[in-house]
Design a protein with these regions (language model features):
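Glycine-centered tight-turn and secondary-structure capping sites
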Residues: 60-63
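RNA-contacting regions in translation and RNA-metabolism proteins
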Residues: 1-55, 68-90
């Protein structure tokens, strides 16, 4: 299984790398983490998939961990000059 699944012309390589690193450091089984990059109008959507039972750990209490991850990934995406949305999927 690949760590990140993107097309060859990634629009947000820095954001994908940062997001993958952060999520892998949170979950118990980092091999199950994938990040898919999807063009979604003017923004790029990053779909983060984690293993079974890991989504709660990534989202955190009241969504604080997910909000923090989104903030850091958006800052990394600004280096790439793109706007991103992040979806956490089970």
């Amino acid at each position: 299984m690949t760590d990140t699944t993107t097309d060859t012309a990634s629009t947000a390589p820095t954001a994908v790398a940062v997001l993958t690193h952060i999520v892998k450091s949170i979950v118990d089984d980092p091999e199950t983490v994938t990040v898919d990059e999807v063009a979604d109008g003017p923004k790029t959507r990053l779909d983060v998939r984690v293993g079974p039972g890991e989504l709660g750990r990534v989202i955190g209490r009241r969504g604080r961990t997910a909000a923090s991850i989104r903030t850091v990934a958006r800052a990394a995406a600004s280096k790439d000059g793109v706007d991103i949305d992040i979806e956490f999927l089970d």
